[in-house]
């Protein structure tokens, strides 16, 4: 599969593969990911929204409704749900996607859970690349849901246009 061609066709499977490549710790995957991202124009027509708050405040439930509002306006919505990592496997342990069931079923939505891999700041070290790939795949609204964080972990604010703190 040529990821560049498939991303231009708005293929969600290609987007998933491209994000997996970006998140990989293998050097060869990083090189491929960097080359892929560099092929896309550096335009930013999307709206990037960061959503943060303490664990259990309702971030995923809010995103479920918020994302549907954008879809009803004719927008394509990507959600990058950053979860805490298992110390053993470094994989995601919560699975916020299950709390966005209706949004996940919509053909104009893409939800990607990703582990933070122990990185502080509420996001992963590859969240920026994931945002760029979602933009390349034609998403109008990109929502980044952080790990439930405290007030000092606001790295996401450097990656988004709008930051929402749920309390």
Range-by-range predicted roles:
Residues 60:
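Walker A/P-loop
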Residues 2-46, 57, 66-152, 156-166:
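Nucleotide-state-sensitive switch-loop elements of NTP-binding domains
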């Amino acid at each position: 599969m040529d990821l560049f061609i498939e991303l231009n066709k708005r293929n969600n499977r290609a987007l998933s593969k491209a994000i997996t490549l970006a998140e990989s710790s293998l050097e060869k995957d990083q090189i491929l990911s960097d080359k892929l991202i560099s092929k896309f124009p550096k335009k930013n027509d999307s709206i990037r929204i960061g959503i943060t708050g303490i664990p259990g405040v309702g971030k995923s439930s809010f995103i479920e409704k918020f994302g549907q509002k954008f879809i009803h306006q004719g927008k394509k919505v990507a959600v990058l749900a950053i979860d805490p990592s298992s110390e053993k496997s470094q994989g995601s342990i919560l699975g916020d996607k299950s709390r966005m069931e209706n949004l996940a079923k919509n053909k104009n939505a893409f939800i990607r859970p990703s582990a933070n891999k122990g990185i502080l700041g509420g996001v992963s070290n590859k969240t920026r690349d994931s945002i760029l790939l979602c933009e390349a795949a034609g998403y109008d609204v990109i929502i980044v849901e952080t790990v439930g964080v405290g007030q000092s972990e606001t790295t996401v604010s450097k990656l988004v246009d709008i930051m929402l703190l749920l309390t």
